[in-house]
């Protein structure tokens, strides 16, 4: 299964990609929103994991572009816990939301859940 991870903190991106690789996912990593958009436009992904706060295009802007291209499930990663962010994500049809900090095992569990649900569509 091919996953795109868009995370601007290199150490975090490396840790998350390693955990996903160990769980048998093939992971491409983009370190900013513009690179994330290029990956999305040039490849097929079963799931996209987006940090909300990104340089270039932020996670919300990137999510709007993802939805124009199809229904690929999206998992947002953020430190923001405000109701406004949750509502915005719902308006943009996010599929799941994970608050930082979190354990890599929790991320893997959420990814599995989203991919199982998406196969049921």
Language-model-derived ranges and their functions:
Residues 1-120:
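N-terminal/domain-start alpha-helical segments
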């Amino acid at each position: 299964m091919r996953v795109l991870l868009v995370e601007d903190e290199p150490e975090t991106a490396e840790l998350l990609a390693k955990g996903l690789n160990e769980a048998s996912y093939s992971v491409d990593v983009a370190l900013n929103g513009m690179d994330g958009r290029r990956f999305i436009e040039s490849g097929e992904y079963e799931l996209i994991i987006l940090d909300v706060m990104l340089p270039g295009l932020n996670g919300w802007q990137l999510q709007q572009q993802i939805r124009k291209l199809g229904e690929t499930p999206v998992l947002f990663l953020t430190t923001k816990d405000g109701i406004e962010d949750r509502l915005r994500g719902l308006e943009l049809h996010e599929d799941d939301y994970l608050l930082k900090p979190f354990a890599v095992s929790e991320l893997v569990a959420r990814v599995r859940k989203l991919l199982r649900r998406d196969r049921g569509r």
